[in-house]
Amino acid sequence: MANLPIEKMRELERRFGEIEARMSAGPAADVYVKLASEYSELQPVVAKIRDYEKAIAEASDLEAMLADKSVDREMRDLADMELPEVKERIEVLEQDIQILLLPKDAADEKSAILEIRAGTGGSEAALFGGDLFRMYERFAANNGWKVEILSASDGEAGGYKEVIATITGKGVFSRLKFESGVHRVQRVPETEAGGRIHTSAATVAVLPEAEEIDIEIRAEDIRIDTMRSSGAGGQHVNTTDSAVRITHLPSGIVVTSSEKSQHQNRAKAMQVLRSRLFDMERQRADSERSADRKSQVGSGDRSERIRTYNFPQGRVTDHRINLTLYKLDRMMEGEIDEVVDALRADYQASQLAQLGEQA
């Protein structure tokens, strides 16, 4: 039996009942919205707690039946058959509840900023950067999320030397946050006459999209420069100084945006700057806890090689969890749920292990 926090579970049930009663009483619209939000957050865990309590009661009844010699032998045989199934259900519910009670990442529900930069490998790395962007774009489409490119630098033979985009939707960051790191590709370039396999790489960074309430940027801490722009992806040439470069003086972070509208560029650049500063704060807080972290998943080390895409073998390997899938074509079409779910499960398992050590 797992060491479940029974008092906390009872408190959650009590709070859930209180919210139900207050919502039924017809509160003001703004109060109702807040209550509904908390209700939807508590509902899954309270449902599991109630299922768990029913299963515990069922197991207790079956054990009492087995111990009572006055009970009909046939009934006791049935109880003996049912009890292992109920105990198995209890174990599954215990694990489900533990996961639902894990500390929540406040950024999980946010949209995300996706940054992909070509690394070693020249034009082949830029092509791979383009392939990765397309993979995430398709994954986003599969989930009903919106993708908008904020800035892009095209590779000489196609793809991207660098591309920055927003992915907007509920829970985007929770699904993509373990994608940060170095992605390596092994394949034969189209220009390679000898059929030799080349290795190149691209770096992916996924940041939670920060809002103004998340991070304060003082006017005196930034310098804004305007310059001539060739537009995102080189699609057009502006004759006005519309491109914007914002430098955050305390951190040295530089962000550029080069759409047609200077006003839009400033807003987009500030959006990326806010997210990078917010991410920097999160990284600092994470590093303070990293001495206790056992799992590589979620370490946020963007210099770490996390995944290899081997095209000749049709193989994808995630090195953090030693997961190998022979589904490269499907993954490059955006079907990355199996890897995303495995990484999330591994991270949750490491959190549970840490809680067990602290108990």
From Swiss-Prot:
Sites bearing N5-methylglutamine, chain numbering: Q235
Keywords annotated in UniProt: Cytoplasm, Methylation, Protein biosynthesis
PTM (free text): Methylated by PrmC. Methylation increases the termination efficiency of RF1.
Pfam families: PCRF, RF-1
Keyword Nucleus part of the UniProt annotation: no
Region (Disordered): 282-306
Entry-linked SUPFAM superfamilies: Release factor
One Gene Ontology term of the molecular function aspect: translation release factor activity, codon specific
Known function: Peptide chain release factor 1 directs the termination of translation in response to the peptide chain termination codons UAG and UAA.
Family classification: Belongs to the prokaryotic/mitochondrial release factor family.
Protein name stated in the entry: Peptide chain release factor 1
Organism of provenance: Rhizobium rhizogenes (strain K84 / ATCC BAA-868)
Annotated gene: prfA
